[in-house]
Regions:
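C-terminal lobe/lid and adjacent interdomain/linker elements of RecA-like ASCE P-loop ATPase modules
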Residues: 4, 10-17, 93-95, 104-106
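Conserved NTPase motor "head" modules and their coupling/switch loops across ABC/AAA+ ATPases, GTPases
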Residues: 6-46, 72, 79, 186-267
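Phosphate-binding glycine-rich loops of NTP-binding sites
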Residues: 37-74, 159
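ABC transporter nucleotide-binding domains
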Residues: 39, 57, 127-129, 151
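Conserved, well-folded catalytic cores of nucleic-acid-processing
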Residues: 61, 154, 158, 173, ...
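Nucleotide-state sensing region of NTPase/ATPase domains
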Residues: 63-147, 156-159, 163, 218-223, ...
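Long, charged N-terminal accessory/stalk domains
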Residues: 139-141, 146-193, 197
């Protein structure tokens, strides 16, 4: 039997098994309750019966959001006022863990672990590791770099607790800088300095995390590809970033004039 190409790779996640899921008013699933196998689960049905929405509910329990629609109010069944997803998991020590998510229209959603509500949703990310595979994943190769960055963000955020915080802070600073760059009048250079410093500070964390992720991924990717190609071909990956051009703050500030000309940051 061929060797498993994933053997002997360093594990970053604890195994979590979904034992049971209950769904109420989630997209076209009005009510459902399923007990699941710890091995392979297959769902059969006609188009439009809710197979993908069931998988999206599982995704929601891991990432606090839908894989397809970022607007939570739109995932509530059209003639209902709320949705609820309940999941019962089992960790490697066979301890049960309950995850609850619910939201009413016009209010914020509530996420709870063992009946205790999270203060911040980012505290939940990484508890239940999950990879969502779909036909749209072809864009990782055929699409632009944004899709590949998104994949890195999804994976890294599940094992690096500070990554989401850095990513959110970077994006906030980026939006503020872009707003200044789009102004008709000359933007306040002192304000630009502030937001560029924020971008550099959080961007360094993001760059280092992505660089380390790619370095971890390369031997796994090569091992799998070698297994698939029977050793006839070799492949590799390389992460290219603006941060590799030098000190990130210097890079951002050097590009200020160019970014001002196009009206947004190119980083």
């Amino acid at each position: 039997m061929p060797a498993n190409p994933l053997c002997n790779t360093h594990r970053l996640f604890q195994l979590m098994i979904l034992k049971k899921i209950s769904i109420l008013n989630f997209k076209n699933i009005r009510e459902a309750s399923l007990e699941l196998s710890p091995n392979l689960n297959c769902f059969l049905g006609h188009n439009g019966e809710g197979k993908t929405n069931l998988l999206d509910a599982v995704y929601y329990l891991s990432f606090c959001r839908s894989a397809f629609n970022p607007i939570d109010s739109q995932i509530i069944t059209h003639d209902q006022d709320f949705f609820v997803i309940d999941g019962i998991y089992e960790n490697e020590d066979h301890d049960p863990i309950s995850i609850y998510c619910g939201m009413k229209r016009g209010t914020k959603k509530h996420f709870k672990r063992d009946k205790k509500e999270y203060k911040r949703l980012s505290q939940h990310i990484g508890l239940i590791p999950l990879i969502f595979v779909s036909p749209a994943d072809q864009t990782l190769i055929a699409g632009g770099s944004e899709e590949r960055r998104r994949l890195m963000d999804v994976v890294i955020s599940q094992y690096d607790n500070g990554y989401i915080e850095a990513l959110n802070s970077y994006n906030k600073a980026l939006q503020q800088r872009n707003a200044l760059l789009k102004m008709d009048d000359e933007p306040d250079s002192a304000l630009l300095d502030i937001w560029e410093q924020e971008m550099a500070r959080h961007g360094e964390h993001i760059f280092q995390a992505r660089q380390e992720f790619v370095e971890r991924l390369i031997p796994v990717f090569q091992n799998i590809y070698r297994h698939v190609s029977d050793g006839h071909e070799e492949v590799s990956l390389r992460y290219v970033s603006h941060a590799q051009r030098g000190d990130l703050l210097d890079v951002i500030q050097r590009d200020r004039f160019k970014d001002r000309a196009v009206g947004y940051s190119l980083h």
